[in-house]
UniProtKB/Swiss-Prot annotation:
<dbReference type="GO" id="GO:0005829">
    <property type="term" value="C:cytosol"/>
</dbReference>
<keyword id="KW-0699">rRNA-binding</keyword>
<feature type="domain" description="S1-like">
    <location>
        <begin position="1"/>
        <end position="72"/>
    </location>
</feature>
<dbReference type="GO" id="GO:0003743">
    <property type="term" value="F:translation initiation factor activity"/>
</dbReference>
<comment type="subunit">
    <text>Component of the 30S ribosomal translation pre-initiation complex which assembles on the 30S ribosome in the order IF-2 and IF-3, IF-1 and N-formylmethionyl-tRNA(fMet); mRNA recruitment can occur at any time during PIC assembly.</text>
</comment>
<dbReference type="GO" id="GO:0043022">
    <property type="term" value="F:ribosome binding"/>
</dbReference>
<dbReference type="InterPro" id="IPR012340">
    <property type="entry name" value="NA-bd_OB-fold"/>
</dbReference>
<keyword id="KW-0963">Cytoplasm</keyword>
<dbReference type="InterPro" id="IPR006196">
    <property type="entry name" value="RNA-binding_domain_S1_IF1"/>
</dbReference>
<keyword id="KW-0396">Initiation factor</keyword>
<dbReference type="GO" id="GO:0019843">
    <property type="term" value="F:rRNA binding"/>
</dbReference>
<comment type="function">
    <text>One of the essential components for the initiation of protein synthesis. Stabilizes the binding of IF-2 and IF-3 on the 30S subunit to which N-formylmethionyl-tRNA(fMet) subsequently binds. Helps modulate mRNA selection, yielding the 30S pre-initiation complex (PIC). Upon addition of the 50S ribosomal subunit IF-1, IF-2 and IF-3 are released leaving the mature 70S translation initiation complex.</text>
</comment>
<dbReference type="Pfam" id="PF01176">
    <property type="entry name" value="eIF-1a"/>
</dbReference>
<comment type="similarity">
    <text>Belongs to the IF-1 family.</text>
</comment>
<keyword id="KW-0694">RNA-binding</keyword>
<dbReference type="InterPro" id="IPR003029">
    <property type="entry name" value="S1_domain"/>
</dbReference>
<protein>
    <recommendedName>
        <fullName>Translation initiation factor IF-1</fullName>
    </recommendedName>
</protein>
Length: 72
């Protein structure tokens, strides 16, 4: 089975939720719930409210995503 292409979008962290979950507003205005990717968790990358992040969304559920990059 072929791997589905994920959608990458830029966004801003609005709120911090429990269990390393975040509420992120995307550039197009949609608000999604996102968690930190494994490599960011392993390297102790801190994400705070207001940070610019790159979120990876799957085509199956566009309301949830994974934070894969935090802009400086």
């Amino acid at each position: 089975m072929a791997k589905e292409e994920n959608i990458e979008m830029q966004g801003t962290v609005l709120d911090t939720l429990p269990n390393t979950m975040f509420r992120v507003e995307l550039e197009n205005g949609h608000v999604v719930t996102a968690h930190i990717s494994g490599k960011m968790r392993k390297n102790y990358i801190r994400i705070l409210t207001g940070d610019k992040v790159t979120v990876e969304l799957t085509p199956y559920d566009l309301s949830k995503g994974r934070i894969i990059f935090r802009a400086r």
